[in-house]
């Protein structure tokens, strides 16, 4: 499959809106709650003078993460319900990783993928590093048979709970707690085939059996194996890399 460079733009919607950004931060609404989070690429000045927020995540002093949330208003510790496209219902929460348990900027990606699979009979797709499953459920809601893979038992448990919330518990979704690279290698040996693969790998991580993942070292082999699970009729291999500052051209090479 030849790399395809497409600009995807997310439109404002009821569940999420990017209200403003600047000075290394962004101001967002998630439903009726407002949050401030770091955004290193927002180097310009904000448009608004004030950002009244329920909570703000203040990062640590280095690029490797860290930091904490500071609440200006009470925020439920066990999360609160949100939805995507009035189809996927899930629990959002202020995580230690500066996000809220899902990635709203993936909205145009999920819509694009659904469009790619729209003409496929019984499409089968895989979500690697699938986290809490909002992307998995977005594709499942459009009729795809899904394989959801994440090394975290807790994340997969939350993804299954989100499927229950969405009324999708009986959908054809395989929930896999496993090291993504090992699982994909086994799928290659099994000669499996997919219509689409989405992966969102971290910079560094550990599998359920202590496997170590380092993006710069392990990504090329994983991508090579993913390509073996696709054929000329497959619709996409979609890689997101928020964890490191690489251009699409570098990744495409």
Stretches found by the model and what they are:
Residues 10-28, 35-104, 111:
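Non-catalytic substrate-recognition/targeting regions of SAM-dependent transferases
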Residues 44-45, 210-253:
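C-terminal substrate-binding/active-site "lid" region of AdoMet-derived donor-dependent transferases
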Residues 104-121:
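Conserved alpha-helix/loop element of class I SAM-dependent methyltransferases that forms part
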Residues 121-131:
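Conserved class I S-adenosyl-L-methionine
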Residues 132-144:
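Conserved SAM-binding loop of SAM-dependent methyltransferases across substrates and taxa
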Residues 145-150:
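Conserved SAM-binding motif I beta-strand of class I
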Residues 152-198:
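S-adenosyl-L-methionine
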Residues 201-202:
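Switch II (G3) loop of P-loop NTPases
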């Amino acid at each position: 499959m030849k790399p395809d460079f497409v600009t995807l733009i997310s439109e404002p919607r009821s569940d999420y809106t990017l209200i403003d950004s600047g000075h290394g931060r962004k101001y967002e609404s998630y439903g009726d709650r407002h949050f401030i989070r770091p955004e290193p690429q927002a180097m310009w000045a904000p448009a608004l003078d004030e950002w009244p927020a329920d909570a703000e995540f203040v990062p640590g002093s280095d690029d490797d993460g860290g930091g904490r949330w500071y609440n200006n208003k009470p925020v439920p510790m066990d999360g609160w319900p949100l939805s995507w496209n009035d189809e996927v219902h899930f629990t959002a929460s202020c995580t230690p990783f500066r996000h809220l348990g899902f990635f709203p900027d993936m909205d145009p990606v999920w819509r694009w993928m659904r469009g790619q699979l729209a003409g496929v009979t019984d499409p089968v797709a895989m979500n690697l590093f699938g986290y809490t499953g909002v992307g998995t459920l977005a594709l499942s809601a459009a009729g795809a048979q899904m394989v959801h893979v994440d090394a975290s038992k807790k994340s997969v448990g939350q993804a299954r709970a989100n499927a229950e919330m969405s009324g999708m518990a009986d959908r054809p979704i395989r929930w896999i707690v496993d090291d993504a690279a090992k699982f994909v290698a086994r799928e290659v040996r099994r000669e499996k085939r997919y219509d689409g693969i989405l992966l969102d790998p971290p910079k560094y991580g550990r599998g359920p059996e202590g496997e170590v993942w380092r993006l710069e070292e392990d990504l090329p082999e994983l991508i090579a194996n993913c390509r073996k699970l696709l054929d000329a009729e497959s619709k996409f291999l979609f890689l997101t890399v928020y964890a490191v500052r690489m251009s699409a051209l570098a990744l495409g090479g």
